[in-house]
Amino acid sequence: MKLTCVLIAAVLLLAVCQLDSADATAYMRKDPSLRSPKRTRGCKTKGTWCWASRECCLKDCLFVCVY
C-alpha cells in the first residue's frame, strides 16, 4: 500500500513538472531572446529544410522549419 502511494505521488510530481516545462517552452517561443545560446547552437532557422522537429531551433518542422 505504501509503495502504491509513493508511486502515485511520483507520477503526479512528474506530470506537474512536464506541464511546467511545457509552459516554459511556450513562453520561450513567444520571446526567442529567452532561449539560451547553448540550446540553439547548431539548430536550423526558419525556412531551412528539416527532417525532424529536433533539428529546428524552436522544434516546429513541416519539411522546413516553421519558426
UniProtKB/Swiss-Prot annotation:
Disulphide-bridged cysteine pairs: 43-57, 50-61, 56-65
Protein name as annotated: Conotoxin Cl6.10
One GO molecular-function entry: ion channel inhibitor activity
Pfam family, one: Conotoxin
GO cellular component, as recorded: extracellular region
Species of the source: Californiconus californicus
Tissues/organs with expression: Expressed by the venom duct.
Cleaved signal peptide residues: 1-24
Keyword Kinase among UniProt keywords: no
Key words, A-Z: Disulfide bond, Knottin, Neurotoxin, Secreted, Signal, Toxin
Domains (record comment): The presence of a 'disulfide through disulfide knot' structurally defines this protein as a knottin.
InterPro entries recorded: Conotoxin
Protein family membership: Belongs to the conotoxin O1 superfamily.
Residues of the propeptide: 25-37
Localization per record: Secreted
